[in-house]
UniProtKB/Swiss-Prot annotation:
GO terms for cellular component: cytosolic large ribosomal subunit. The keyword Ribonucleoprotein applies. Pfam families: Ribosomal_L23. One of the early assembly proteins it binds 23S rRNA. One of the proteins that surrounds the polypeptide exit tunnel on the outside of the ribosome. Forms the main docking site for trigger factor binding to the ribosome. GO terms for biological process: translation. Keywords: Ribonucleoprotein, Ribosomal protein, RNA-binding, rRNA-binding. The gene is rplW. Belongs to the universal ribosomal protein uL23 family. PANTHER family: 60S RIBOSOMAL PROTEIN L23A (PTHR11620). It comes from the Bacteria. The keyword Ribosomal protein applies. This is Large ribosomal subunit protein uL23. Part of the 50S ribosomal subunit. Contacts protein L29, and trigger factor when it is bound to the ribosome.
Length: 100
């Protein structure tokens, strides 16, 4: 499969704001929904350039669809890709700190 060239703004879709993600922030870990075509190198480059921080490592998870039902109608949630970005010591993403 040929990988398309993604711009840095297309790599990160949105930050994930959950109870678990807020606990991870204390360990310098930030969680993002990312483009399904993105890889670890693209995510690292995007976070470093967009937020002006240094990234230590990136973990990526493919989230599978979950079955859902509304009355007699059955369906699934969409599949998506999640990235957990660990920042180097002394760095935080100030734009995301005010959201909780």
């Amino acid at each position: 499969m040929k990988q398309e060239k993604l711009s840095l703004h297309d790599v990160l879709i949105r930050p994930i704001i959950t109870e678990k993600a807020l606990i991870l922030r204390e360990q310098r870990k930030y969680v993002f929904e990312v483009n399904p075509l993105a890889n670890k190198n693209l995510v690292k480059e995007a976070v470093e350039k967009l937020f002006n921080v240094k990234v230590e490592k990136v973990n990526i998870l493919n989230m599978k669809p979950k079955p859902k039902r509304r009355g007699i109608f059955e369906g699934k949630t969409r599949s998506w890709k999640k990235a957990v970005v660990t920042l180097k010591e002394g760095y935080t993403i100030k734009e995301l700190e005010g959201e909780h």
